[in-house]
Amino acid sequence: MNRLHTRYNKEIAPALKNQLGVKNVMQVPRLEKITLSVCLSEAVQNPKILNTVVDEITAITGQKAVITKAKKAISNFKLRAGIPLGVRVTLRREKMWSFMDRLNTLALPRVRDFRGLPNKGFDGRGNYNMGLKEQIVFPEINYDKVDKTRGMNITICTTAKNDTEGRALLEALGMPFRK
């Protein structure tokens, strides 16, 4: 079991139970899944770029990424339905806890000019969305082999009912929010 998952079960969940005033430990919010996605506009002209992005996301997460395709055609962007556009991976269970631990302890401290995560990323149901501008903040990516820095969107889904519960959970897990 991952060290963050162990800490959640032994320390964080009982503390959140008291803080949020719930009667049962099963009502305490917990992580459900983490989704990483990368969308590339240059993949329309050169679909082979997606293979390098799949390799990078697979190295970061430890799980094979899936190539996503355009749902409908948009002529202004020279886009046809079915063209590969991006990469996505959904993490659950131990890989999710491992990624969350590495995100908090290794990746976010390496972001340039980092002053904390904004509070605007919550969706009203306790889930949090954030974006990273560079994939090189993760130690699994070799800086010399990167042809171009690309960003990614990270969605953290929780079982929280509202944003205050979700924020309390993520702060307890070590997410550095702005004051």
Swiss-Prot record:
Residues that span the membrane, as ranges: none
Entry keyword RNA-binding: yes
Pfam family, one: Ribosomal_L5
Highest taxon of the lineage: Bacteria
Keyword Repeat: no
InterPro entries: Ribosomal_uL5 (IPR002132), Ribosomal_uL5_bac-type (IPR020930), Ribosomal_uL5_C (IPR031309), Ribosomal_uL5_CS (IPR020929), Ribosomal_uL5_dom_sf (IPR022803), Ribosomal_uL5_N (IPR031310)
PROSITE patterns: RIBOSOMAL_L5 (PS00358)
GO biological process, one term: translation
GO-annotated molecular function: rRNA binding; structural constituent of ribosome; tRNA binding
Any Gene Ontology CC annotation: ribonucleoprotein complex
This protein's UniProt keywords: Ribonucleoprotein, Ribosomal protein, RNA-binding, rRNA-binding, tRNA-binding
Family designation: Belongs to the universal ribosomal protein uL5 family.
Function: This is one of the proteins that bind and probably mediate the attachment of the 5S RNA into the large ribosomal subunit, where it forms part of the central protuberance. In the 70S ribosome it contacts protein S13 of the 30S subunit (bridge B1b), connecting the 2 subunits; this bridge is implicated in subunit movement. Contacts the P site tRNA; the 5S rRNA and some of its associated proteins might help stabilize positioning of ribosome-bound tRNAs.
Assembly, per entry: Part of the 50S ribosomal subunit; part of the 5S rRNA/L5/L18/L25 subcomplex. Contacts the 5S rRNA and the P site tRNA. Forms a bridge to the 30S subunit in the 70S ribosome.
Protein name as annotated: Large ribosomal subunit protein uL5
